[in-house]
């Protein structure tokens, strides 16, 4: 008899062909999620000899949930239960995207074995490694000469300030469980047990405890988990927590948490990007802006403005992303504006769903953007082709949004009122608002902050891109920590026209990794890292 042969098609799917025998029925041709051959034929049709030992029952059951394979009684149209049901069906070894090296030809499904001892040795190695990240200490003696030190000791020349306030900031997209389950196709490479919240949350909390940041900016914080687990756990670690849930029926939001011992809270300012009266703004993303006062017993220090957001993902809606960013910058401008007309230092964190070098990223760093002729799908840099995409309109958002092209709240001119004694007076403007004159239609956007990125996004020695997220479909940088650098640490930017009270000096950052690094531990999430994003972490000094 001529043996069945397998022809590889696509990701993890094999199609069974035949020699001189009739074709199988259509519903029995796929060996993926839809069916499994009888055990005897499965051994014949598979070129990978590990298949005979790869199927096991996870855990210890008093009675197996399904019978073992038999050519007499196994149903060819059997379908496994849902990915996140409480009881697991049989499981197979790991799947990886075709763009990366694979050692086994035959991959059946995303149901992964629990027992690492039963996996092929080439796959077992993935589950034994851990991510190695280290602190990179940075000293800016001047903007032309920046040192990055890879050891555990800070450059002594950096320790030159007597009046200083040092603090650390973490930005972390912790991956909402509901979003994980709604987008399970992004996690085909994962072993199923590592995707359960009961496994993931202890790992996430362990990371937070280990790094012990003074300020946490968290994204994709699921509301029910926040109330029952996340907030109580963080409060027990000495954090004060503020949370803004996404609008509509979205289950998650953004949180900013800070150590009681380091800061006191001056104001909380949530930002909703959904506006019923603006058709463009029909998405439920949010931001959160806090004004924090450093606790320094013997010195007077400026406040610090901390912002956190998660912008829209959709790569083809750059107009919405830019408008959401402008709304966040307008709120930051309002909150950070001091009574003396200057602005306090700013830290802006989040998942911006935009890649380094994209127009949106460049706008944040350079303070200006001319978007005339820019395709809507090119704004975030996630789309490689702009064919069939419309051009950004001028202006991007309508006047009734109340935000100028300088990304500040517009203040309407109030008509002068005549007092009974004949004097003409005008109500005094709120000092936290910025007066903006009427502007002609322009394709130029600006903001008034000198913002730098904590990370350079490429390895200094090789130029290989760093990544902050890595799953079955993508590995790229979308998460950032931006900060208002002291004047000596950043070149003057065209949009930066405001005076700052002090400035932030970047002392150190936790190193990032490459896509290749992450796939050595089977991508994200994995046994030790329970989000599909890496936490970003930076240490700053506020000069007093």
Swiss-Prot record:
Pfam families with a match to the protein in the record: ANGEL2_N, Exo_endo_phos
GO BP: 3'-UTR-mediated mRNA stabilization
Domain of life, per lineage: Eukaryota
MF annotations from Gene Ontology: catalytic activity; mRNA 3'-UTR binding
InterPro entries associated with the record: ANGEL2_N (IPR045816), CCR4/nocturin_mRNA_transcr (IPR050410), Endo/exonu/phosph_ase_sf (IPR036691), Endo/exonuclease/phosphatase (IPR005135)
SUPFAM superfamilies reported in the protein's UniProt record: DNase I-like
PANTHER family with a match to the protein in the record: CARBON CATABOLITE REPRESSOR PROTEIN 4 (PTHR12121), PROTEIN ANGEL HOMOLOG 2 (PTHR12121:SF27)
Family of this protein: Belongs to the CCR4/nocturin family.
Name by which UniProt lists this protein: Protein angel homolog 2
Organism, as annotated: Bos taurus
